[in-house]
A protein has these predicted regions:
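PLP-dependent class I/II
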Residues: 1-270
């Protein structure tokens, strides 16, 4: 099951509807996974009010929450949000070094109740016995013997400039029919086009123009919802390349919209 989001994060009203629907079938939700900070793919952040409501629902319907926070330290504007884990012990908190040090270091951490950690440790041992000791020593050295917080501030400055470049280019080049999220941090933003647009069918044209994106339906369990959406990533390219990429992508979108408008005028699409 998946729960839609808006600019304030996961829709708690729709989550509660889903919980009630599951309960009518004599079943219950056991665990909910969420990225409350700068969610992938939408880039949105769950508000404090919705975080509080999510915890209330977890008690009311008796389920655990997995709080995945890979991007939480990469904030470019706004204030720090208190983690769900800091508010309730019904939460399993996941963190990673890969977004704030080096993507090739797949080292992370878990904060969870002791009994849950014991079971996770057994599963981990069955999967790979032990994570790379060398990688763990590198990470330990990074946090202990280097000015890592200063390095993190450089990352935040660089990524923030790239985000700003993408948002400015979207405002300048994208058609009025398009809308998008305004991420306060992280790597991604979410573009929504008119419902009759299929972004997946546009991907080949975008690649031919030298740009790419991730079609929205890739992020939905039914493979249908989100077909008129796309995820954009601003973390890698320079601001100049991002601006040019958005200009090219806007041209691809505008050409496709012109085609759809012709069908609308002919009455083939309503």
């Amino acid at each position: 099951h998946s729960v839609p989001f808006d600019d304030e994060g996961m829709r708690m009203d729709l989550l509660e509807e889903e919980l009630k629907r599951i309960g009518k079938g004599n079943k219950r939700l056991k665990m909910l996974y969420t990225i409350p900070n700068f969610q992938n793919p939408g880039g949105v952040t769950m508000t404090g009010e919705r975080r509080k409501r999510l915890i209330e629902l977890s008690h009311e319907y008796d389920f655990m929450i997995i709080e995945d926070d890979p991007y939480g330290r990469l904030r470019y504007e706004g204030g720090h949000m208190v983690p769900l884990k800091a508010q309730d012990d019904r939460v399993i908190y996941l963190g990673t070094i890969s977004k704030i040090f080096a993507p090739g270091l797949r080292i992370g951490w878990i904060c969870a109740p002791v009994d849950v950690l014991a079971r996770i440790s057994l599963v981990k041992q069955g999967a790979d016995l032990c994570g790379s000791t060398f990688d763990q020593v590198v990470v330990e050295h990074y946090f202990t013997d280097t000015p890592w917080q200063r390095t993190l501030q450089k990352f935040i400055k660089t990524y923030g400039e790239r985000r700003d470049a993408m948002l400015a280019a979207l405002e300048e080049y994208f058609p009025p029919e398009a809308s998008w999220t305004h991420p306060e941090g992280g790597f991604f933003l979410w573009v929504t086009l008119p419902k009759y647009v299929d972004t997946g069918s546009m991907l080949a044209d975008a690649l031919e123009a030298g740009v790419t994106f991730c079609p929205g339906d890739s992020f939905y369990v039914d493979g249908v919802t989100g077909r008129n959406c796309m995820r954009l990533n601003f973390s890698y390219e320079t601001p100049e390349n991002i601006t040019e990429a958005i200009r090219r992508l806007a041209k691809v979108i505008e050409e496709r919209l012109e085609l759809y408008r012709a069908f609308i005028d002919a009455g083939a699409i309503k």
